[in-house]
Amino acid sequence: KLLEGTFWEKQEYHNISESTMRSLLRRYSGTQAVSNFRPTAAALMYDKFLEKASPLFGTKAGTTWDMSCGYGGRLLGAIAADVNYIGTDPCTETFEGLKQIKEDWAGLNRTIELHQVGSEEFWPDKNSIDLCFTSPPYFDWEKYSEEETQSYKKYPEVQDWIDGFLWHTIDKCHYGLKIGGILALNVANTKRIKNFEEVTVRIAKEIAYKHIDTWKLQLSSQTGTP
């Protein structure tokens, strides 16, 4: 399935250990994280846009904010790429899984910071983030739970969701990003929001982002299509 990744500025690739990635995939292949967003694809994004810690060159690991963690695919990618990760997600069940991943794989060279809250309510530290990267929920297409904290429950109408969830999430990314930082959103038009891609770009420009590029990202197939 092709999804559009929309980006708002680039770097060198870091060689990901194949044995490490295989270990991660074996450990968590029973969850939806691997099929929902491949850790390998996430790791490549981090390799492209984030610095790596290097005592030799005096660089520190970059920081990414995953605004909608889901089942942890991007978290696993951040672990493999050895970068700092901030994650937000309101779903109780998936959040427990994210905490288990952190417990199993947290290392000395990276920080993993998890918050059980919707991204539209989370205030990151100002100018502290290098990359904001996620696949936002497609309104009520992705229902991780029936909890009232879910964005489709809090904002039950499409326009309310766009104004209340999507706009405020993109705005808080702008607050947290460093100058020259990147916002990368994996979005696609859906039956419920037929112009989702256009709306996302419009909101970002209104908030003062500069639209740099749009990529086509090949993801593993999922049940149904948005």
Where are these regions (language model features)?
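Class I S-adenosyl-L-methionine-dependent methyltransferase catalytic core
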Residues: 1-226
